[in-house]
Amino acid sequence: MFPGSVIRKLSHSEEVFAQYEVFTSMTIQLRGVIDVDALSDAFDALLETHPVLASHLEQSSDGGWNLVADDLLHSGICVIDGTAATNGSPSGNAELRLDQSVSLLHLQLILREGGAELTLYLHHCMADGHHGAVLVDELFSRYTDAVTTGDPGPITPQPTPLSMEAVLAQRGIRKQGLSGAERFMSVMYAYEIPATETPAVLAHPGLPQAVPVTRLWLSKQQTSDLMAFGREHRLSLNAVVAAAILLTEWQLRNTPHVPIPYVYPVDLRFVLAPPVAPTEATNLLGAASYLAEIGPNTDIVDLASDIVATLRADLANGVIQQSGLHFGTAFEGTPPGLPPLVFCTDATSFPTMRTPPGLEIEDIKGQFYCSISVPLDLYSCAVYAGQLIIEHHGHIAEPGKSLEAIRSLLCTVPSEYGWIME
């Protein structure tokens, strides 16, 4: 086999995802009839529009990673007939192998009675959540056009997305002296942290494993009430959810005197000038930090307001914009001496995806796949079709415990504050 052409070298911020072979996936439950040929045409059009998605990764002689073009066509959709299931399992191999040395993008369709399950797997070095959501939306839009008109739409090949480092350099943003993590130094080794049992996680190089995930959905009414509550108190949904997660973690940890370090990504597309299109960059994220000092009388509105105030201050002084330039390519979890970190993504608002007549989206689920021996523990949030989704990813002893407590808090807060739907 002859080596392919190198498209470009992965940047520092992208290499961490290559080192741990990190893929993200979005699984969509569909009800109705699926036109497999039209979906195949839509997927081909997506790849022609974003040709870099058909590439793969190769390690370079200096230990880094290269993005390499393939001479062969992408393998296309993997279709599994789940209607011939035995013992509840679809016929064929439903476990798609994820191999970054072969492909960075996969699409799997499992046909079921009355519908299907569609999963798009995307290597994290090529796309963050915002970028990935736009690709899924484009796939469904092209599929709808292919079904209704016979044509998946115009194709204009897009350039290879830029790394975070390249985008920041274009805008004159350079590494400063502070990363934002300095606010955690005051609690480093300042408390006696109770020992917790760490689950063993076996890494299998070349075979990324699914990270367990549990999740909750709020109803449209519950989500609407929560958003109205936030507007009343001039708070974003992200801030209210973050405060609820931190209050829940404080309660479950049973260490009331120990502050909680909180870290969350900030989509810099909304911050930089000129703005950046969703698929113009790979992982265009800054890291925001907050030290939650919670007590028995801590109020969710006060906590959320302080999170927002801290974020605004860090954006104003430029810390968040350059924060990603400070971090290495090794993931080691919470640093020694620091209380366990809480990490949560911002609530991405997914567009209401187009579907042809007779096909409906019933459910959406995200998942991570990676080869890493450090146990993961993180929250992710999204809003789809007016409903808030919170997922808890990781190797956690009681995965549903925190989510149920978060649900209870988020659903009771509007009424406890006397907010009533008119």
Swiss-Prot record:
Residues flagged as site, Structural role in the organization of the active site: 128
Upper classification of the organism: Bacteria, Bacillati, Actinomycetota, Actinomycetes, Mycobacteriales
A Gene Ontology term for the protein's cellular component: cytosol
Other information: Was identified as a high-confidence drug target.
Post-translational modification: Phosphorylated by PknB at Thr-198. Dephosphorylated by PstP.
Pfam families: PapA_C
Swiss-Prot/TrEMBL keywords: Acetylation, Acyltransferase, Lipid biosynthesis, Lipid metabolism, Phosphoprotein, Transferase
Organism: Mycobacterium tuberculosis (strain ATCC 25618 / H37Rv)
UniProt pH dependence: Optimum pH is 6.5.
Gene Ontology biological process terms in this record: DIM/DIP cell wall layer assembly; lipid biosynthetic process
Function: Catalyzes diesterification of phthiocerol, phthiodiolone, and phenolphthiocerol with mycocerosic acids, the final step in the phthiocerol, phthiodiolone and phenolphthiocerol dimycocerosate esters (PDIM) synthesis. Can directly transfer the mycocerosate bound to the mycocerosic acid synthase (mas) onto the substrate alcohols. Is also able to catalyze acyl transfer using various nucleophiles as acceptors and several acyl-CoA thioesters as donors in vitro; preference is observed for saturated medium chain alcohols and long chain acyl-CoA thioesters.
EC identifiers of the protein: 2.3.1.282
Residues the record marks as active site: 124 (proton acceptor)
Residues carrying N-acetylmethionine: 1
UniProt family annotation: Belongs to the acyltransferase PapA5 family.
Name of the protein in its database record: Phthiocerol/phthiodiolone dimycocerosyl transferase
Site (Important for mas ACP domain recognition): 312
Quaternary structure annotation from Swiss-Prot or TrEMBL: Monomer. Interacts directly with the acyl carrier protein (ACP) domain of the mycocerosic acid synthase (mas) protein. Interacts with FhaB.
Entry-annotated residues carrying Phosphothreonine: 198
Catalytic reaction equation(s): 2 a mycocerosyl-[mycocerosic acid synthase] + a phthiocerol = a dimycocerosyl phthiocerol + 2 holo-[mycocerosic acid synthase]; 2 a mycocerosyl-[mycocerosic acid synthase] + a phthiodiolone = a dimycocerosyl phthiodiolone + 2 holo-[mycocerosic acid synthase]; 2 a mycocerosyl-[mycocerosic acid synthase] + a phenolphthiocerol = a dimycocerosyl phenolphthiocerol + 2 holo-[mycocerosic acid synthase]; octan-1-ol + hexadecanoyl-CoA = octyl hexadecanoyl + CoA
Gene Ontology terms, MF aspect: acyltransferase activity, transferring groups other than amino-acyl groups; O-acyltransferase activity; transferase activity
Comment, domains: Consists of two structural domains that are related to each other.
Cross-referenced NCBIfam families: PRK09294.1-2
Keyword Nuclease: no
